[in-house]
C-alpha cells in the first residue's frame, strides 16, 4: 500500500495492477485462502437482493443529492475516459465486462479486501481501527480517481467511505461489496451509453438550489 502509490507518477493503471499483483501473490502464498481477504461467503440470493437494495439507496443518495451538489460547487466530473461508450453498443458491452472484472472485483479485492483489512489489523483490529482504516484507504481511493476532476475525486472518496463502512459491518462478505460496486457502476455506464440520466440531475438541482 505504501509502495504502490509511487507508481502513480508513471501511470495510474500501473499503481492499480502493481497492488493487485501483490495481493494475488499473498493470496497464492496463503494457498488461496479467500477468507483472508474477506471472501468467506458464497453468493446467495439473499446477498444479491441485499446488494441491489443498497445499490438503489446509494444511487438515490449520491446521484440525486451528493453528485448534484458537488458538481454545482466544484464543477462537473471529467468522464472523458468513458465518454466514447455513448451510443456505442460494442464499447458498452466491453466496458461492462471490464467494470465487473477490474472495478467491481479488482478494486474491492484490492482496496477493501487487502488494503483496508490489512491496515485495520495492523492498527490493532478493533472497531475504531477499522473505521480509521476505512477513512485512510478511502482517501487513497479518492485521490486515485483525481483524473475525474476535483468533484469526481471527492465523490469517489465519499462513496468509497460509505462502502468501506458497509464492509466494516460485513467483514467476511466482500462479495456483497463486489456486487454493490458492479451494479452501481453498471447503472452509471448505462446512463452514459444512453446519454441520459432521465432528467434526474435537473430535477435534483432545482430541488436543492
What are these regions (language model features)?
Residues 20, 27-31, 62-67, 107-108, ...:
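Alpha-helical transmembrane segments of polytopic integral membrane proteins
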Residues 1-4, 51-58, 134-136:
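Alpha-helical transmembrane segments
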Residues 7, 18-19, 50, 63, ...:
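Short alpha-helical transmembrane interface motifs in multi-pass membrane proteins
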Residues 24, 63-64, 189-193:
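Membrane-embedded alpha-helical segments of multi-pass transporters/permeases
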Residues 34-103, 121-124, 197-209:
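Juxtamembrane helix-loop-helix connectors linking adjacent transmembrane helices
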Amino acid at each position: 500500500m505504501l509502495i504502490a502509490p509511487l507508481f502513480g507518477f508513471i501511470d495510474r493503471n500501473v499503481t492499480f495492477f502493481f497492488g493487485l499483483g501483490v495481493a494475488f501473490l499473498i493470496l497464492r502464498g496463503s494457498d488461496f485462502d479467500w477468507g483472508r481477504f474477506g471472501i468467506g461467503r458464497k453468493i446467495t440470493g439473499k446477498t444479491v437482493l441485499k446488494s441491489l437494495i443498497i445499490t438503489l439507496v446509494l444511487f438515490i443518495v449520491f446521484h440525486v443529492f451528493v453528485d448534484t451538489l458537488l458538481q454545482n460547487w466544484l464543477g462537473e466530473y471529467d468522464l472523458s475516459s468513458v465518454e466514447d461508450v455513448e451510443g456505442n453498443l460494442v464499447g458498452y458491452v466491453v466496458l461492462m465486462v471490464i467494470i465487473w472484472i477490474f472495478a467491481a472485483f479488482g478494486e474491492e479485492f484490492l482496496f477493501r479486501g487487502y488494503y483496508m483489512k490489512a491496515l485495520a489489523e495492523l492498527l490493532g483490529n478493533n472497531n475504531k481501527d477499522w473505521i480509521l482504516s476505512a477513512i485512510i484507504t478511502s482517501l487513497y481511493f479518492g485521490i486515485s480517481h483525481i483524473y475525474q476532476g476535483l468533484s469526481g475525486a471527492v465523490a469517489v472518496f465519499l462513496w468509497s467511505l460509505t462502502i468501506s463502512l458497509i464492509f466494516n459491518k460485513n467483514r467476511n462478505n466482500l462479495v456483497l461489496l463486489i456486487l454493490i460496486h458492479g451494479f452501481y457502476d453498471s447503472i452509471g455506464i448505462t446512463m452514459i451509453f444512453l446519454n441520459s440520466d432521465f432528467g434526474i440531475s435537473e430535477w435534483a438541482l432545482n430541488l436543492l438550489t
